[in-house]
Amino acid sequence: MAVVPIRIVGDPVLHTPTSPVPVGADGSLPADLPELIATMYETMDAAHGVGLAANQIGYGLRLFVYDCADDRGKAAHRRGVVINPVLETSEIPENMPDPDNDDEGCLSVPGESFPTGRATWARVTGLDAEGNPVELEGSGLFARMLQHETGHLDGYLYLDCLIGRHARSAKRAVKSHGWGVPGLSWLPGEGPDPFGH
């Protein structure tokens, strides 16, 4: 296990749909998958993220880890992994997102956040770390996280979901940081935290 660099917007691995994690006829998962999952958790924790998709650290495989609050109560918090997730959502609003309630950030767009329209409810089905079926659903931040991480695995970032002035602001931010090109990354725990944690 180790904290590894997180790829920044513009890296081709972030803009390419991931491949399903192979599952054996007996339901077995690849022998090296636990090590990848542990690395993903450690990297997400070091970055203070609520989720991390495998392609954000350079692996084109369909899985993500999460550590996210949900709306089931003040202390409700969920942590886990979803392998080969399939997403289902309520309708995504067509109106302009609310800057006060719909702000979203991403570890692959360090230090930036923009209002992003998302469905208020989401469910993901897939497999857990042992290859057992798992189903997660939620609303609020948890639903946003499920949509965000599954989007990564489908080859797009939340920036691709932005509309209007928010999309224009994001393009300016990417350009001003010199992002949008292959090969850029940042290492959580090294230098200033781009999110101010």
Swiss-Prot record:
Name of protein: Peptide deformylase
Biological role: Removes the formyl group from the N-terminal Met of newly synthesized proteins. Requires at least a dipeptide for an efficient rate of reaction. N-terminal L-methionine is a prerequisite for activity but the enzyme has broad specificity at other positions.
Enzyme class label: hydrolase
Cofactor names: Fe(2+)
GO biological process: co-translational protein modification; translation
InterPro entries named in the record: Peptide_deformylase, Peptide_deformylase_sf
Entry keywords, A to Z: Hydrolase, Iron, Metal-binding, Protein biosynthesis
Family annotation (HAMAP family): Pep_deformylase (MF_00163)
Alphabetized GO MF terms: metal ion binding; peptide deformylase activity
Catalytic activity: N-terminal N-formyl-L-methionyl-[peptide] + H2O = N-terminal L-methionyl-[peptide] + formate
Family: Belongs to the polypeptide deformylase family.
Provenance organism: Mycobacterium marinum (strain ATCC BAA-535 / M)
Entry EC number(s): 3.5.1.88
